[in-house]
Amino acid sequence: MADGKKLSSLDASFLYLETPEMPMHVGSMAIFRLPDDYKGDFFEDFKAMIVSRLHIAPILKARLEKAPLDIDHPSWVEDDQFDIDRHIFRASLPQPRDRATLERIVGWMHAKLLNRARPLWEFYVFEGMKDNEVGLYSKMHHAAIDGGAGAALTNMIYDISPTPRKVDPPTAGAKPGPEPRDIAANLLDSYQQFITQPLDASAAAKNLQLPRTGKSDIGSILFDNAMYQIESAVRFAGNIPTMVKSVSEVLGKISDPKSRESLASMVSPPTMLNKSISSERSFAGVSISLSRSKALAKQAGGKLNDVVLALASGVVRRYLKEHSTLPAKSLTAAVPISLREEGNTEANNQVFGMICSIATNIEDPKARLEAIIAQSTKSKEMSHPLRALMPQISNISMLGAPMMMQILALVYSRSNLSDVLPPAANITVSNVPGPRQTLYAAGAELLHIFPVSISTHGQALNITVQSYRDQLDFGFIVGANIIPHVQVMCDMLPEEFAALEAAYASPVADIKGAAE
């Protein structure tokens, strides 16, 4: 990560939207098993391993640097006072020191804001658990990372064998920067670069790079922002044909009567899950078989994500029905979709989302899954043309945005507007692909990695799943004022999975919950 790299508008938005009731960090609850003959200090071994690899994950040593007067997005700069002991902590669990206890502690910890004066991440190591297990709760601000980058970071930090791999130390000495040049000379170079581009105006516009001062005084920030706005305007103009095509496709779909029916199904009914949340969280996790889930998706003619949505739908439907609050109209889910290209491991956010009906108005599990497959296919078709627009929208920058966005977020939070406004979606469901091979850290085998995501005003429940080896690890996080004990909801998932398998005549094997 280049020192002084300014956050994109999408990354920075997670900072501006953050309030004490709505922290914007993501994390995980990992479970390790120590070797039977292990005699060391896992906390110290783990910390030493992280220290030796900090240079291959530069985001771990980067802190935020605000622009003067908050007139522009902040930048990532290397923390010259970085102290590993402010980021990795030894923690203890009360009796009975099992996974259920760890889940309750993780829910409490996840509600606490990260210190913005330091790099925005923390690890907590819980030793002394049952069955020679060790728990690891990690959290990192969403401004620095999305699910795809998080999975890449996992592969960077962990090993694929019990013996830690050797990592080359960082290269000594900093690379010399470019010689300072007169700003007029840089402008001339940029102009020459632009006019010598191929005749393809779109390509020339996309490749335009105007000079920056790279300084942090107000005058330089104003100049750099002006250069950025010019670049953005030129690139926007260069992308007009693509954007016009995307908008035309969207309008064409909307004019189709069948598409209008699909859009109507995406309107979210109000539920108990769509209220303002407190600063407290409830968390729980559970695992099911990945291969069996894929087989189920194949039998149903859908994708793995459809099965994930069907399981979330079944759990939410059952919970609301038991509390006599299930609406007649189907609930919807906000589903993040990654824009990250294969091999891209940059620590930033490259996502957009779609809204999908999850057929909670259908009782039969098989019919519900089939309806979800049909609805998700239509939602993808509706949202596909918007993919081309997302890079333009996510890079919009405006002077003064930090202050204005933070004021609006605070007003939204304090006024409880989500209690009266119609919800954009009822729940959030996210599926993050993870490693298929077994991972290790400091010689300990990684058994599970349960995601711990974000609960927001108006969408109190977030269900995120991470694939690992031959399992799907589900993490349920919710505002505790809405659902005080989300473990109750989490325990329903194995039963919903069994019901789906029974509907498709698949064998049902044991399913292990995170809290067992």
Positions of the model-derived regions?
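Soluble acyl-CoA-dependent acyltransferase catalytic core bearing the H(X)4D motif
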Residues: 1-10, 29-42, 47-459, 463-494, ...
